[in-house]
């Protein structure tokens, strides 16, 4: 694989007015990805062989803060600023319940988001615990519009898809 996915996101304009596409080559990326800009498009080369994987829970996080703000747990985290982002062609896997505490099924999000107009398609979204895909846009701002298609959602707990919105 190439350089870090996070480094590519950081090189994107702060407020892109059109989609900013980041192509991710096949390989295993053991890194947390934080999207804090709108219009970011992550495109994996091969859904089954472009894998972003970490092991974390709310209590045991790789990163607590990013750019001075608290960051939620999850392999990919979309902050409030990450509206209109697309994730496609990836396997996103939180394997905490396999490698750190076997059998533990507490919340182990693969993708967590607070952004609006999030599109996740043609991807595997896996977690060893509850809430593999959890998008929670701010309801008071009218947020919560999501589109999902052609997903393989897996979790060993409950709520493989835990949305708030429409």
Regions found by a protein language model. Name each.
Residues 27-28, 46-48:
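Acidic glycine-/aspartate-rich tracts in secreted/extracellular proteins
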Residues 1-23:
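Acidic Gly/Asp/Thr-rich repetitive segments characteristic of extracellular carbohydrate-active
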Residues 10-15, 30-41, 52-86, 96-116:
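Extracellular beta-strand-rich solenoid/capping regions of secreted or surface-exposed proteins
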Residues 22, 41-45, 88-89, 123-125:
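Well-ordered beta-strand segments characteristic of repetitive beta-sheet solenoids
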Residues 78-166:
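Right-handed parallel beta-helix
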Residues 22-24, 110-111:
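Extended hydrophobic secondary-structure segments that form protein cores and membrane-embedded regions
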Residues 46, 56, 91:
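Short, small-residue-rich loop/turn micro-motifs
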Residues 20, 29-30:
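General structural concept
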């Amino acid at each position: 694989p190439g350089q870090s996915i996070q480094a590519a996101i950081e090189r994107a304009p702060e407020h892109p007015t059109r989609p900013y596409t980041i192509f991710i080559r096949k390989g295993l990326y053991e890194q947390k990805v934080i999207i804090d800009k709108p219009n970011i498009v992550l495109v994996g080369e091969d859904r089954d062989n472009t894998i972003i994987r970490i092991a974390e829970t709310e209590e045991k996080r790789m990163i607590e803060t990013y750019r001075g703000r608290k960051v939620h747990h999850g392999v990919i985290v979309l902050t409030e600023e990450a509206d209109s982002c697309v994730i496609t062609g990836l396997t996103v896997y939180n394997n905490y319940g396999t490698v750190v505490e076997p059998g533990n099924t507490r919340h182990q999000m693969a993708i967590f988001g607070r952004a609006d107009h999030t599109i996740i398609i043609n991807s595997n979204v896996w977690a060893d615990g509850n809430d593999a895909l959890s998008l929670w846009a701010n309801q008071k701002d009218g947020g919560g519009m999501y589109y999902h298609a052609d997903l393989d959602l897996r979790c060993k707990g409950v709520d493989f898809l835990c949305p708030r919105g429409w």
